[in-house]
Amino acid sequence: KYPPFGKRGAGFSIAHDDYIPADVSSTIQQANEHGLVIVQIESPEGVANAREIAAIDGVDVLWIGHFDLSNFMGIPAQFEHPEYLAAVDSVLDACKQEGKVAGQLGQTVEECLLLLERGFRSVAFGLDLDLYRRSLTSGLEQIYRSRALKQHSV
């Protein structure tokens, strides 16, 4: 948020304004009214303070950075570890108690569905680079198979 509600840097008539010059005061007011504030929970300290963070007026979403959180917990990428699951539950509980949204990234459709079932209300699907890699791999495999079939059928 822009002051007096936050400490966001100011830049106007650029990409987030579609490069359209506008009245700065109305732009600030509109951004403050409609902007979404997402805070990342990526450490045990963030988990321990999730309730206090969620209680901050103006915070809309607590987003779990699952790789960073598991890494800082000393259990990298062990997303089924009981300590990791307890940390996630703690953040979900904080969001429920304070009426905030919990969010996280899911890398597969199945992961996204599980996150939604657990109570996450904001779920991002896949990393852009990973989705791009999967698409390229699939396409190249089809091309190679097609080429191999043609070579053997001549």
Regions from the language model: what does each represent?
Residues 1-57, 68-71, 152-153:
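Conserved anion-binding
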Residues 1-4, 129-153:
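C-terminal helical cap(s) of enzyme catalytic domains, especially alpha/beta-barrels
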Residues 1-2, 55-61, 117-123:
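Glycine-enriched alpha-helix->loop->beta-strand junction motifs that scaffold or abut catalytic
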Residues 2-12, 72-86, 126-128:
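Glycine-rich tight-turn/loop motif centered on a GG-T
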Residues 37-42, 62-64, 102-105, 122-125:
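Hydrophobic faces of well-ordered beta-strands that scaffold small-molecule active sites
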Residues 53, 65, 115:
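Conserved, mostly hydrophobic/aromatic
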Residues 62-71, 120-139:
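Glycine-rich phosphate-binding active-site loops on the catalytic face of alpha/beta enzymes
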